[in-house]
């Protein structure tokens, strides 16, 4: 799980205004950090299939959030993809 400090750092990097924790950019960045954490977890715990389902749900959630952002504002979408290094 993400530490509070790490989550706050992500929010500070992607926020649009003061107190912003719910913009698509922030949500996508937090989901990406959780996905990276779980991916590393599975390198050690190969048989943890229960958590693997959670990972797939997170990936789907991030995908939907990216699709939403792409339909609303293509420039913001491209910026987030570039900053996070997500293949697309």
From Swiss-Prot:
Family: Belongs to the universal ribosomal protein uS15 family.
Keywords assigned: Ribonucleoprotein, Ribosomal protein, RNA-binding, rRNA-binding
Protein's name according to its UniProt entry: Small ribosomal subunit protein uS15
Species assigned in the record: Trichlorobacter lovleyi (strain ATCC BAA-1151 / DSM 17278 / SZ)
Its job: One of the primary rRNA binding proteins, it binds directly to 16S rRNA where it helps nucleate assembly of the platform of the 30S subunit by binding and bridging several RNA helices of the 16S rRNA. Forms an intersubunit bridge (bridge B4) with the 23S rRNA of the 50S subunit in the ribosome.
Disulfide bridge positions per record: none
Oligomer status and interactors: Part of the 30S ribosomal subunit. Forms a bridge to the 50S subunit in the 70S ribosome, contacting the 23S rRNA.
Cellular component, GO, one term: cytosolic small ribosomal subunit
One GO MF term: rRNA binding
Stored Gene3D superfamilies: 6.10.250.3130, S15/NS1, RNA-binding
Source organism, top-level taxon: Bacteria
GO BP field: translation
Signal peptide range in chain numbering: none
NCBIfam families assigned: S15_bact
